[in-house]
Amino acid sequence: MHLYKKLLLIIVILTPTNLFAEYEININFESGFEFESQKILISDLKNSKSKKQIEKILKRQDWIKDFSIVYKPFKKEVYVSITNRKPIFVLNNQFFYDINLHKFKFDNSKRDLVIVQGPVKNEEDILEIITRIDSISSINFNLSEINYSY
């Protein structure tokens, strides 16, 4: 019985310490390290204290296309795998757009995209212009900027 009390005391002492410990988070960016937002994400995740908080932080990121999380049981180890959205163009230096026209914040970190300026009401028009120019293989043309007006 005496040994049982000692064991219970050790568990009571160690449990709160383990509950408030920070997670060791291992992140794999499957699409590469492209955005300034990824640096901010790493910083935010480093300070997270719970599994729910880690998931909330990841779900808030509009530039993430998909992610998976693996938790090591009985350890504070987390493995996160992230697939980035691949931007096609930047509209008015405010938002990236991917091939599915999903809009996410532009953070000035990726500059080798088509820069679109102007009052665009339908983003599909821009994507069609880019697609048509890229599909013409007979011309050697590098599209870097579109000044859109109608």
Question: Model-flagged regions — what are they?
Answer:
Residues H2, L19-K51, E55-K56, R60-Y150:
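Charged, solvent-exposed interaction patches on well-folded alpha/beta domains
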Residues K6-T15:
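Sec-dependent N-terminal signal peptides
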